From Swiss-Prot:
Its EC number is 4.4.1.17. Residues 1-95 are annotated as: Disordered. Keywords: Heme, Iron, Lyase, Membrane, Metal-binding, Mitochondrion, Mitochondrion inner membrane, Repeat. HRM repeats lie at residues 35-40, 56-61. This is Probable holocytochrome-c-type synthase. It is found in: Mitochondrion inner membrane. One of its GO terms (cellular component) is mitochondrial inner membrane. Belongs to the cytochrome c-type heme lyase family. One of its GO terms (molecular function) is metal ion binding. It catalyses: holo-[cytochrome c] = apo-[cytochrome c] + heme b. InterPro entries: Holocyt_c/c1_synthase. It is an enzyme of class 4 (lyase). The keyword Calcium does not apply.
């Protein structure tokens, strides 16, 4: 009979995966995302400096140098921080997410170096997470994969409920881990769900006819895949800040009850993802 004990290689892979999960939680708690956070007062005091070598965002950055769509410097800091323990790539990858206001352009992800610098600025302490260069690159891969998955979930809502717009595009986004959504609070208080460890808000341009806010809650799915390091479960849905969004969510809730609870057929042509895979 085979041994039930895991091999050292498997144990190392599991340890790497757990370390990466812990780091992602602490990064989200520090602010999440890759933006340089600036207060209105700091923006008003603009003086044209760039982010320093340590990843600090300028107290007086030129207003024109800040992209209001992602609160990121137009020429972001790619220099290593003074106490950085290893070099990180500065190459940025293109996403598949179409960018509003352009014909064919897509959003570009931050490089590992940009991500590191932004996290330091938000108060993250890399010493607490003992990350390696490989860990950091895996975190970037997970970050990008989560964004791609979130966009696919947005498209399920848009394609099902608003097929008149052939190509919705992402206009802007921000991370806001400390601002729990009403849905997340309700699930935690009354249904016993864990709280999400991160939250993002995306503004989607619906072919120029409307700008729609989507809320994305990031839940810890428990088991970490040792190969992909993925562990996040996404809850993607329109925000309840507009009568149209509320109606869309009511329609989807009705369809889910009709087809999934009562067992009516046919099922939804594109399964909506409100609460998709968030199992507790």
């Amino acid at each position: 009979m085979g041994s039930s004990q895991s091999t050292p290689k498997v144990q190392d892979a599991n340890a790497d995966a757990e370390r990466i999960r812990k780091a992602q939680h602490s990064m989200a708690a520090a602010g999440g995302g890759s933006q340089c956070p600036l207060t209105p007062e700091q923006r008003a005091a603009a003086s044209g400096e760039n982010c320093g070598a340590g990843g600090a965002c300028p107290v007086g950055a030129d207003k024109a140098s800040i992209n209001p769509l992602n609160n990121e410097l137009e020429h972001p800091n790619q220099k290593p921080a003074p106490d950085q323990p290893f070099a990180l790539p500065t190459k940025r990858e293109k996403s598949t997410i179409p960018k509003a206001g352009t014909e064919t352009e897509t959003w570009t992800y931050p490089s590992p170096q940009m991500f590191w610098n932004a996290m330091l600025k938000k108060g993250w302490r890399w010493q607490d997470d003992s990350l390696s260069k490989s860990d950091m690159e895996n975190i970037i891969s997970i970050h990008n994969a989560n964004n791609e998955e979130a966009w696919r979930e947005v498209l399920k809502w848009e394609n099902l409920l608003h097929p008149e717009c052939a190509e919705p595009k992402l206009k802007s986004f921000k991370g806001d881990a400390k601002n729990l959504s009403p849905r997340a609070r309700f699930r935690n208080l009354f249904l016993g769900y864990d709280l999400p460890f991160d939250r993002h808000d995306w503004i989607v341009d619906r072919c120029g006819t409307k700008q729609v806010q989507y809320v994305i809650d990031y839940y810890d799915g428990g088991a970490v895949d040792p190969s992909s390091k993925l562990f996040t479960i996404l809850d993607v849905r329109p925000a309840v800040n507009d009568i149209g969004n509320i109606w869309d969510r009511m329609v989807v809730a009705y369809w889910r009850f009709k087809f999934e609870t009562l067992g009516f057929t046919p099922s939804l042509p594109i399964p909506p993802t409100e609460g998709h895979n968030v199992n507790h």
